[in-house]
Curated annotation (Swiss-Prot):
Record gene name: sodh-2
Record note on quaternary structure: Homotetramer.
One Pfam family linked to the record: ADH_N
Cofactor(s) it depends on: Zn(2+)
Residues the entry annotates as binding NAD(+): G181, A182, G183, G184, G185, L186, G187, D205, K209, V271, G272, L273, R343
Residues where Zn(2+) 1 binds: C47, H70, C157
Protein's name in the database: Alcohol dehydrogenase 2
GO terms assigned for molecular function: alcohol dehydrogenase (NAD+) activity; zinc ion binding
Length: 351
């Protein structure tokens, strides 16, 4: 079943080789299988992982040529013959991870991103930097009519990644969490989700992002580049160390520092992806202080629903910058320069 006026071709942003030119081209509109939806993409968030993919950091897992993007939101325009629970006109979200098996121990326990059978939009299959995309009905996320669709798009990866990583810290209301890279796209989500969850936030980033972080709700701000002995400073600021740390910064030093200023029995969660992520570990300190170290990547269907609900209810308000599909290369450069302080979203109605 299809709505009217679906074109044969569409605009898509493609690269032929890692680090190569990013070009908007005309490609065929995909046809959905019997258990798939065809979604007209209205918005697609631009994630730091898209930059990593284009640069070849995920070459071991990605395909090339590739249409990137994995934070899509739009409207269902075609449904396959065996699709259940969806109608034409429904609003749908497309998240990074799809095609998980639903039968392994990870899928059955709510840890779908760890399934060995997953595929990733914008990495090993064409993603959301195109006007139309197919997705299995069970992988699509329902987005209510009460939700701002442009705001929902970046939640499908960036927002849920920040939200789930904060849950992983086990920081309780009233306790302190430190967020490194707090002024970037993930950190901007992180500050607001942390506040909504009752945490007290120490934001760590370049001094130019202090006002931005404080406006989002950070109680304290620490200059990541010019603070003498940042470890001692944060330990003093937090009266003995943070209860939890989420390292959004895509650099090794913040990860190393986090292990030093987290308090005894605290939890450090690594999210940011530095190019060379190998760091030294003081195992004696980890053992004697009972420090927990975790990695965290995106979230389950339930995590996504919960993260979007904060947006729908107006509790989380992360600034969004709307751009054209042709602007993605310049956004990547700004990401590399550390000059992104909001979630940047492609608006497909902009030409």
């Amino acid at each position: 079943m299809s709505s009217a006026n679906i074109p044969a071709t569409q605009s898509a942003l493609i690269f032929e080789k890692y680090g190569g030119p990013l070009e908007v081209r005309q490609v065929s509109v995909p046809q959905p299988q019997e258990n798939e939806l065809l979604v007209k993409i209205e918005y697609s968030g631009i994630c730091h992982s898209d930059l990593h993919t284009w640069e070849g950091d995920f070459e071991y897992a990605s395909i090339c040529p590739l249409i990137g993007g994995h934070e899509g939101a739009g409207t269902v325009v075609t449904i396959g013959s065996k699709v259940k629970g969806w109608n034409i006109g429904d609003r749908a979200g497309i998240k990074l991870i799809n095609a998980n098996c639903l039968n392994c121990e990870y899928c059955k326990t709510g840890h779908e991103p760890l399934c060995d059978h997953i595929q990733n939009y914008g990495i090993d299959r064409h993603g959301t930097f195109q006007e139309y995309l197919t997705i299995r009905d069970i992988d699509a996320i329902k987005v209510s009519n009460d939700t701002n669709l442009a705001a929902a798009a970046p939640v499908l990866c960036g927002g849920v990644t920040a939200y789930k990583s904060l849950k992983a810290t086990n920081v309780k209301p009233g306790q302190i969490v430190v967020l490194t890279g707090a002024g970037g796209g993930l950190g901007s989500f992180g500050i607001q989700y942390a506040k909504a969850m009752g945490m007290r936030v120490v934001a760590v980033d370049h001094i130019s992002k202090e006002d931005h972080c404080r406006n989002l709700g950070a109680e304290w701000f620490v200059d990541a580049f010019d603070t003498p002995d940042i470890v001692a400073h944060i330990r003093k600021l937090t009266n003995g160390g943070a209860h939890g740390v989420v390292s959004f910064a895509a650099a090794k030093k913040p990860m190393e520092y986090a292990l030093e200023y987290v308090r005894k029995r605290g939890t450090v969660v690594f999210v940011g992806l530095p190019k060379d992520g190998t760091i030294p570990l003081d195992t004696l300190s980890l053992i004697c202080n009972e420090i927990t170290v975790k990695g965290s990547i995106v979230g389950s269907r339930m995590d996504v629903d919960e993260a979007i609900d904060f947006i729908t209810r107006g509790i989380v308000h992360v600034p969004i910058e709307l751009v054209k599909l042709e602007d993605v290369p310049s956004v990547y450069q700004r990401m590399k320069d550390g000059k992104v302080t909001s979630r940047v979203v492609v608006d497909f109605s902009m030409r």
